[in-house]
Amino acid sequence: MERLLINTIWRSYATKLTGSQVKLMARGLPKKQPIIGVQDIIVVASGKGGVGKSTVAVNFACSLAKLGKRVGLLDGDIFGPTIPLLMNVHGEPVVNDKNLMIPPQNYNVKCLSMGMLTPVETSVIWRGPLVMSAIQRLLKGTDWGLLDVLVIDTPPGTGDVHLSLSQHAPITGVILVTTPHTAAVQVTLKGASMYEKLNVPIFGVVENMKYTICQNCNQRLEFFKDSRISSLPRKLISLPLDSRIADSNESGVPVVIKYPDSKYSYLFTQLAEEITQILNEQRCNQNQNNSAH
């Protein structure tokens, strides 16, 4: 019975392409159009949910701003937006005379999220095409002004949002976020594989909730002695599990703003400086290649 069911499904889908499918495939992928005024686009992604990806995106964006960069932060999680809470930005954005949204700003970071366009208690129930259309609207229907970096916080997994961004926006690179859990690492490997197939550079991995610091003896306590993190692209930083980070998230004040002299602020500054160096090297190599031609 099971074999019959599999064969039936196979016959239903493994058929000759229709004329419309042939025409659609002949068009190829959409041509990536730059976002007006935006120099670099960095995606923050994860395979599993709950690994702290949005926390990393928010504090990374704020750390770039503290370095003097002009920064925007786009919440690409259409179904579960958290940027309004984490950045304490609420209310609908103003629309200018060109029908472009003006992103509100906090902590010197311009922010935009689907959470600003829908009531908190309202869920978004959309299929793929609507999600992809919403992402394009948030990206290109916004007056970002002049930005050095646009950070995009994406939903977990490898779904429509990731594909839409990769196909429509010139992504400079990706930062992957994971915890040391085997399950999280395995799914992050799948995400890395997807971006490699899409020819999007992977800057590295942020390992979150790697350890904690004992409040009594100040000793570093590792949660996972054996981890598969080494199977992922190069590690950028390892972050601790700490109640102050959770407290910062709840209060809408990123930890790098609330505790500017803390170890966490130092680590995120280190991340921002390293990514800035990578961007500078990329630009230098690109200029050299252009000169050679």
From Swiss-Prot:
Binds 1 [4Fe-4S] cluster. Its cofactor is [4Fe-4S] cluster. It is found in: Mitochondrion membrane. One of its GO terms (biological process) is mitochondrial respiratory chain complex I assembly. Disulfide bonds: none annotated. GO terms for molecular function: 4 iron, 4 sulfur cluster binding; ATP binding; ATP-dependent FeS chaperone activity; iron-sulfur cluster binding; metal ion binding; phospholipid binding. Gene3D superfamilies: P-loop containing nucleotide triphosphate hydrolases. It comes from the Eukaryota. Keywords: 4Fe-4S, ATP-binding, Iron, Iron-sulfur, Membrane, Metal-binding, Mitochondrion, Nucleotide-binding, Transit peptide. Homodimer; dimerization is not reliant on iron-sulfur cluster binding. Belongs to the Mrp/NBP35 ATP-binding proteins family. PANTHER family: IRON-SULFUR PROTEIN NUBPL. This is Iron-sulfur cluster transfer protein Nubpl. It comes from Drosophila melanogaster (Fruit fly). The lineage of its organism: Eukaryota, Metazoa, Ecdysozoa, Arthropoda, Hexapoda. The gene is Nubpl.
